């Protein structure tokens, strides 16, 4: 629920990365930070033979408008999820498994699925949630919706009763995951938020 004001980056890049690719990567980071009004306060870059793709570590810092202290919940609460499960994972699969997917689906279908990756920030819904006084928030990243539900239940110290049919998931995600034999409920789900 904090307002991010700055980040520090640590990049580890492979020896084979071209300067043009590094410039493109940094331009993307800079554009995203400008769009979100976040300052890049510093960082570190190193070249390593131990990585094959760029590894980016981000440390964010910010502030809370007011201190909020909650005790463990004494009553039942509803869990609300923003956006859709597995959107980030779907975008990754579209990139890494493009040849296989192009043999099965039309370019129109794949382009439609790729458009969802443009909405991976949870900043707006997190700000609304804080203003609304939500009890807890958890982003759906590693481990997908299943991992996030487990972590949320541990965070607030209660068990959960979840109806899988009510978890929002795009049809494109379902079909792509089915084609590749991937469980969409365990797929990386950046861009969605549990509240």
Regions found by a protein language model. Name each.
Residues 2-194:
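Helix-biased detector of long, well-ordered alpha-helical tracts
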């Amino acid at each position: 629920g904090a307002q991010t004001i700055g980040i520090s980056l640590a990049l580890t890049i492979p020896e084979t990365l071209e300067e043009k690719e590094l410039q493109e990567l940094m331009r993307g980071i800079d554009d995203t930070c400008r769009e979100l009004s976040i300052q890049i306060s510093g960082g570190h870059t190193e070249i390593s033979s131990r990585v094959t793709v760029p590894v980016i570590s981000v440390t964010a810092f910010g502030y809370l408008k007011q201190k909020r202290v909650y005790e463990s919940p004494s009553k039942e609460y509803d869990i609300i999820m923003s956006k859709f499960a597995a959107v980030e994972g779907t975008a990754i699969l579209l990139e890494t498994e493009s040849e296989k997917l192009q043999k099965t689906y039309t370019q129109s279908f794949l382009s439609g699925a790729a458009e969802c990756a443009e909405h991976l920030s949870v900043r707006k819904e997190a700000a609304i949630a804080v203003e609304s006084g939500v009890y807890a928030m958890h982003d759906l990243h590693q481990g997908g919706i299943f991992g996030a539900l487990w972590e949320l239940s541990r965070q607030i110290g209660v068990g959960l009763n979840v109806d899988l049919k009510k978890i929002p998931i795009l049809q494109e995600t379902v079909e792509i995951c089915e084609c590749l034999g991937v469980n969409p409920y365990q797929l990386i789900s950046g861009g969605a938020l549990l509240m």
